[in-house]
Amino acid sequence: MKVNSILCSVPVETPGGKLRRKRSEGPSPIMPKIAITSLNHWTLKNGFKQCKFYDIDMLYPEDKDIAKFFSENDADIVGLSAVVSTSYLQVKRISKIIKEINPKALIVCGGYLTAAADTVLRKTDVDVCVVGDGEIAWTGLLAYASNAQRSNTKVRSEEL
């Protein structure tokens, strides 16, 4: 059985904050996130072809647009790339939207925010935090979920 996964970039700005018109210019430009795009490539390279990339950071969609995306794209596992600690409120907001749409989705958070993994796991809807490089952990989670589907068992974060 195929595992449907979605990797998402997470904005660093506070939710609801006013964005600059040209976010990619100026002294602190918003740049494409290399780690999450590399992880997406690694996922596809390792045979998990059902992986989509949702660039929330660059698109900066409203809550209703995020909800629409996840209602149209049923995911077994969602990866959130939180590159800085200021992403916390965004992770909290986005993970809540995902769980409201798809309560069975396993939400995985990676990036520097996971230095505070205990807080992220207690205060958000994130199920798993990956600390450090995520390529091996992410494909391991996808393999685990794929095996769980084949054996008709539930993916449980405490077993990982």
Regions found by a protein language model. Give the residues of each.
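Aromatic- and Gly/Pro-rich amphipathic surface segment
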Residues: 27, 32-33, 37
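Short glycine-rich His-centered loop
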Residues: 2-29
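Proline-rich low-complexity regions
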Residues: 10-11, 32-33, 118
